[in-house]
Amino acid sequence: MDAYSLSPTDSTTYSSDTFSTEFHTDAIAPPGNTPGNYTLDYNECFFNFCECCPPEKGPMGPMGERGLPGPPGERGPLGLPGEKGETGLRGPPGPAGLPGANGLNGDIGEKGDQGPVGLPGVPGIPGKPGEKGDPGLKGDKGERGFSGLKGDPGERGEPGLNGTKGSIGREGPMGPGLAGTKGLKGEQGLKGECLQGEKGERGPPGLRGEMGLNGTDGVKGERGEPGPLGGKGDTGARGPPGPPGGRGMAGLRGEKGLKGVRGPRGPKGPPGESVEQIRSAFSVGLFPSRSFPPPSLPVKFDKVFYNGEGHWDPTLNKFNVTYPGVYLFSYHITVRNRPVRAALVVNGVRKLRTRDSLYGQDIDQASNLALLHLTDGDQVWLETLRDWNGXYSSSEDDSTFSGFLLYPDTKKPTAMENL
């Protein structure tokens, strides 16, 4: 009881839901405004009937005696599930109880200690084979395996057909001709002689004259005319050798010489570099549940016979070309109840087509094979056309699709490498 409760001497009684839980002021609402039965003594007319005059809160009274236990309350609603508590310590084993009903599957507990080996149980009834699971995701590419041992040499093949005549080769460069010999110095020409005029006859001696005075120098005479050309002289001595002459024109190609004697065997060369063997192949089949595949879509080959390199994609039902080169593809289709038209498709282009017109319960086989040159990134698959989708498979008959790399492309030598 609180400060607002009635005194112990009051004879007023109320039901459990007398007072309302909503208040307009701090005062307690009058009992007449609440539902339920109650009794009011006339001496208690001082009780607050009006919200305008709320009573003041008095001091807290002494704690009363403990009342009798009330009747059990109604069961409340189911509470929210609590959080999972931590695993407690393992208690001592209790006595074996009676087998209870099977409870709900609980969370997986921690792995316990290994118990003692039990007695062999009664063999159970063999279960039914489970349904086939969905194909798993494509695994990561495995690491490179070790190089295999060198195989035995194969048998010698039959001689090939005569090849076509090759085109005429280009004109070769000028050959290293011999340099011409140094020419001899030409002979020196003869010295020409000038003819001398004939000497005149001597005149008679004159009288001796007296010594005359020294005369002045006379005027210098004019140069005389050149004499006539002399005759050819004798051959002179041999002169020194002249300068080397220019390079002569290349001579004609000589005849092929005789084959020389075989030389001695050369030393053993260093070991060559190891070449990684490139492989790419697949072989898949059709499960009976995939018979009569939908047309114009890649046929879903689920039965994998070989896919060692992982180049066949089972999710897309396509072969992914990883190495450029020449590939061989073949397919063998069992036909039943309806005709079939199949096509080998490369990047959306139908390269090879096959048809087999069959009706009724007869069974037939349609097959084909082709060599294709493909590049890195190409995709190859098999599909049926329109409503001619009689591809069939059973426990006795298979429809297969296979392919492998026949030989990869090789690097072509450049002009500099040829030199």
Swiss-Prot record:
User: Ranges for the C1q domain?
Assistant: 275-412
Signal peptide coordinates: 1-19
**Which residues does the annotated region (Nonhelical region (NC1)) include?**
275-419
Residue segments, region Disordered? 63-275
For this protein, the record's Pfam families field holds: C1q, Collagen
Where composition is biased (Gly residues), the residues are 227-236
Name the record gives this protein: Inner ear-specific collagen
Matches recorded under InterPro entries: C1q_dom, Collagen, Collagen/C1q_domain, Tumour_necrosis_fac-like_dom
Region: Triple-helical region (COL1), residue numbers? 58-274
So which residues have sugars stuck on them?
A: 37, 320
Q: Which Gene3D superfamilies match?
A: 2.60.120.40
Name the keywords, alphabetized. Collagen, Extracellular matrix, Glycoprotein, Repeat, Secreted, Signal
**Principal location listed in the UniProt entry:** secreted
Q: Which segments of the protein form a coiled coil according to its record?
A: none
> According to its UniProt record, in which tissues is this protein expressed?
Specialized secretory supporting cells at the outer perimeter of the saccular epithelium.
Here the segments flagged for biased composition (Basic and acidic residues) are: 129-144, 184-202
Record bears the keyword Repeat: yes
Which residues does the annotated region (Nonhelical region (NC2)) include? Answer: 20-57
Its subcellular locations are: Secreted, Extracellular space, Extracellular matrix
Any Gene Ontology CC annotation: collagen trimer
Task of the protein: Forms a microstructural matrix within the otolithic membrane.
